[in-house]
């Protein structure tokens, strides 16, 4: 029979067991390495040119670019994508340049960018550049800061990277559908 005394004993034992298990788990966490030698220090900046190291992208693909009149030019194509999530399990998604997530756009602080976005989706779209300081007309909010990119048309985003960081981009048109599609 359950009474108050038995309930309190059981609850106390359970709390003691949980506290003990938590302490044991903390003891299993390895300590962070201490930088005691030059081998563990980050590499020095190159002696000439811009201090820059290419990133390793998770999806393994960085968007190619060309330099034209001091501006890095990139080309993105918003289009339907079929992605195999597991053997025999395919998903119909929307992405950029044949993949989802889209390719990494690699640049450094101070770079001037020109990004051509061609819409091959079945509806209008835009691109919103999360966290990037840029002119209002380049923010990607269709109908508010820029026109929507109609099906089959190309829109040119042009801005300068004013701060370094890792930022994401995504559609800002019919968001519930377009973000859900990838």
Question: What do the PLM-derived regions correspond to, one by one?
Answer:
Residues 1-15:
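N-terminal secretory signal peptides and thylakoid transit peptides that target proteins
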Residues 2-5, 47, 110:
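Intrinsic-disorder/low-complexity regions
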Residues 15, 62-63, 102-103:
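Generic recognition of flexible, low-complexity loop/linker segments
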Residues 15-16, 175:
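Residue-level detector of secondary-structure transition/capping positions
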Residues 17-21:
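Hydrophobic h-region of N-terminal signal peptides that target proteins for export
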Residues 73-182:
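Histidine- and aromatic-enriched segments that form or immediately flank copper-ligand environments
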